[in-house]
Regions:
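Bacterial N-terminal signal peptides
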Residues: 7-17
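N-terminal "domain-start" segment that seeds a small globular fold
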Residues: 20-39
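Solvent-exposed loop/turn segments at secondary-structure junctions
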Residues: 54-58, 66, 87-92, 125-127
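Typically the conserved alpha-helix immediately C-terminal to a functionally engaged Cys/Sec
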Residues: 60-75
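Thiol-based oxidoreductase modules, predominantly thioredoxin-like and allied folds used
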Residues: 75-100
Length: 128
């Protein structure tokens, strides 16, 4: 039960609209999760992966109303490492174990079937 506290807290925090971030600001895209894991280990911050699709209106709403404002605050006082994964793209990605894949394949491997999907991870890629 205690393993659910962080995700539930974050979901509750995300349910309260924070306003809009500056238009056009892009969220950080996942490139090398190994590097992100090293940073998470040093800073002791969780990694939040945002799986989304450009054709998903709920994804856009979550991004604009919640994730962009959270990321803007997060840049001033870091609380997590946010990375995005667009589930229909074949953009290259290095996974936590150093293997090379692409966004679409990685999302499938992670069992992501619906978007938006938030995944809260520790520095070794383990679910929190």
């Amino acid at each position: 039960m205690s393993g659910l506290r962080l995700p539930i807290f974050v979901l509750v925090a995300l349910s309260v609209p924070l306003g809009c971030a500056v238009a056009g600001e892009a969220l950080p895209v996942a490139v090398d999760l190994r590097v992100d894991a090293q940073r998470a280990r040093v800073t002791r911050l969780p990694i939040v992966l945002f799986f989304h699709s450009t054709t998903c209106p709920f994804c856009r709403e979550l991004e604009e109303l919640h994730l962009k404002p959270l990321q803007a605050d997060n840049e001033k006082a870091p609380r997590f490492l946010l990375r995005t994964v667009e589930v229909s793209q074949t953009r290259p990605l290095v996974t936590f174990d150093g293997s090379k894949t692409d966004f679409r394949t990685y999302a499938r491997q992670q069992g992501v079937t619906l978007v938006p999907h938030l995944r809260f991870l520790g520095p070794d890629g383990e679910a929190l």
